[in-house]
Amino acid sequence: MRLFLAIDIPENIKEEIAKFQEQFKMKGIKLVEKENLHITVKFLGEVDEEKLKEILNLDLSIQPIKIKLKYIGTFPNSNYIRVIWIGAYNNNLVEIFKEIDEKLSNLGFKKEREYVPHLTIGRVKFIDNKKKLKDRIEKYKDVDFGEFEAKHIKLYKSTLTPNGPIYEVIKEW
């Protein structure tokens, strides 16, 4: 099964982001469904039942932290856009990631090189009008969705369908 760890976003902020995503409704861009908006902590990929049991036995709980959601960014860079995201800011987020990454590496998962806390709002399949997209990103680069308190890390199962992924919570720490 395909798994990832994430921090949920409060419903009111999801609503705001869903309205904001309208600015990026363009040919070639697949927007993330409102119910699927989250901050990915770590993508685990395909995991078998045995490894899942090991993950479920880990303590991945976190202390409550305030996370600011602001600014627009892109991966891998502004000249070759594949992902459009909103930044997630709190100095402890990177530390939380490192702790979780370390615990998972002990189970055989590959360590990540660098963690950029973010919330993906869209994936670019192809760009019909690169200038229009870059102008839109520039126009909204300082967007601010405020902050919220994160109290949990959730383990999600992701089932890919022709209509997009379906996420199911397996465990909450």
UniProtKB/Swiss-Prot annotation:
Q: Cellular component terms, GO, for this chain's entry?
A: cytosol
Q: Which GO terms describe its molecular function?
A: 2',3'-cyclic-nucleotide 3'-phosphodiesterase activity; protein kinase A regulatory subunit binding; RNA 2',3'-cyclic 3'-phosphodiesterase activity
Organism lineage reads as: Archaea, Methanobacteriati, Methanobacteriota, Methanomada group, Methanococci
What keywords tag this UniProt record? Hydrolase
Return the protein name.
RNA 2',3'-cyclic phosphodiesterase
Q: What family does this belong to?
A: Belongs to the 2H phosphoesterase superfamily. ThpR family.
- Is DNA damage found in the keyword set? no
Location of the motif HXTX 2: 118-121
Tell me, in a sentence or two, what this protein's role is.
Hydrolyzes RNA 2',3'-cyclic phosphodiester to an RNA 2'-phosphomonoester.
Q: Which reaction is this enzyme known to catalyze?
A: a 3'-end 2',3'-cyclophospho-ribonucleotide-RNA + H2O = a 3'-end 2'-phospho-ribonucleotide-RNA + H(+)
InterPro entries for this protein: Cyclic_Pdiesterase, Phosphoesterase_HXTX, RNA_CPDase
Give the E.C. number(s).
Answer: 3.1.4.58
Tell me which residues this entry annotates as catalytic: 38 (proton donor), 118 (proton acceptor)
Highest taxon in the source lineage: Archaea
Where does the motif HXTX 1 lie? 38-41
- Keyword Hydrolase applies: yes
